[in-house]
Amino acid sequence: MSSIDTPANKLQAKTLFHPEHLEYINKQLSELSPQDILKWCRWTLPSLFQTSALGLSGLVIMDMLSKMDMNVPLIFINTLHHFPETLDLLEKVKTKYPNVPVHVYRCAEAANEKEFAQKFGEKLWETDESRYDFLVKVEPASRAYSDLNVLAVFTGRRRSQGGERGSLPIVQLDGPVLKINPLANWSFTEVHNYIITNNVPYNELLNKGYRSVGDWHSTQPVREGEDERAGRWRGREKTECGLHSHPQSKFAQYMAELKKKETADQ
């Protein structure tokens, strides 16, 4: 069995939540505050994790959880191409929230950026974007979800971020996992104010004009009046990373292809 297979005895969100059920849940949760959504998740969902690249929204969720004594484990995908400031922030987060277990996953075939370039070529994100996303995000996330038996994950996505996130529900199925977006209704201003008011550590790049921070090669500061994610993949049609593409993320597509292959081999 490969590291990304899903044994029959593991819970899968898609077997527990049907579309009609999710529609009803979304209607109920849409009236709740983020904190109450987090409480509902604690009462309702086993094997609950947070996945975050340590953007402002993810940090808000982590702080809210900590204040409610909900030490939900964090999954951090090290793409090997993060800014140094992002990796510095990870260490600050560990210090600020010592009771939160942190699981770091990275590409299975390279330990650092230099090894990655040697194995897959320079600037793979330009020559084969889909393969790059798979190697540094999709496969590590798939492995994390399998290793940790993840049923549901908190994400920091918000409708105000625009693009594919404009119609984001509170909860949604993505392959075998349930994704919960407790800050879906919040604006950038609300998120930023929470960070400052509650003294939550944040990425120092935000002091240099950045608002949404991803890999160093695909992130730029935003200009006055631009959407907060305008600095991501500037000049390209892409607006979403490989983990959250709509209607089905590359992670979900990958798991579906894997299942199809297993069935054919039987």
UniProtKB/Swiss-Prot annotation:
Pathway: Sulfur metabolism; hydrogen sulfide biosynthesis; sulfite from sulfate: step 3/3. The keyword Zinc-finger does not apply. The keyword NAD does not apply. It is an enzyme of class 1 (oxidoreductase). Keywords: Amino-acid biosynthesis, Cysteine biosynthesis, Cytoplasm, Methionine biosynthesis, NADP, Nucleus, Oxidoreductase. Pfam families: PAPS_reduct. Its main location: cytoplasm. Residues 219-246 are annotated as: Disordered. It is found in: Cytoplasm; Nucleus. GO terms for cellular component: cytosol; nucleus. Residues 223-243 have a biased composition (Basic and acidic residues). GO terms for biological process: cysteine biosynthetic process; hydrogen sulfide biosynthetic process; methionine biosynthetic process; sulfate assimilation, phosphoadenylyl sulfate reduction by phosphoadenylyl-sulfate reductase (thioredoxin). Signal peptide: none annotated. One of its GO terms (molecular function) is phosphoadenylyl-sulfate reductase (thioredoxin) activity. It comes from the Eukaryota. Its EC number is 1.8.4.8. It catalyses: [thioredoxin]-disulfide + sulfite + adenosine 3',5'-bisphosphate + 2 H(+) = [thioredoxin]-dithiol + 3'-phosphoadenylyl sulfate. Disruption phenotype: Leads to methionine auxotrophy. Belongs to the PAPS reductase family. CysH subfamily. The NADP dependent reduction of PAPS into sulfite involves thioredoxin which probably plays the role of a thiol carrier. Required for methionine synthesis. This is Probable phosphoadenosine phosphosulfate reductase. It comes from Schizosaccharomyces pombe (strain 972 / ATCC 24843) (Fission yeast).
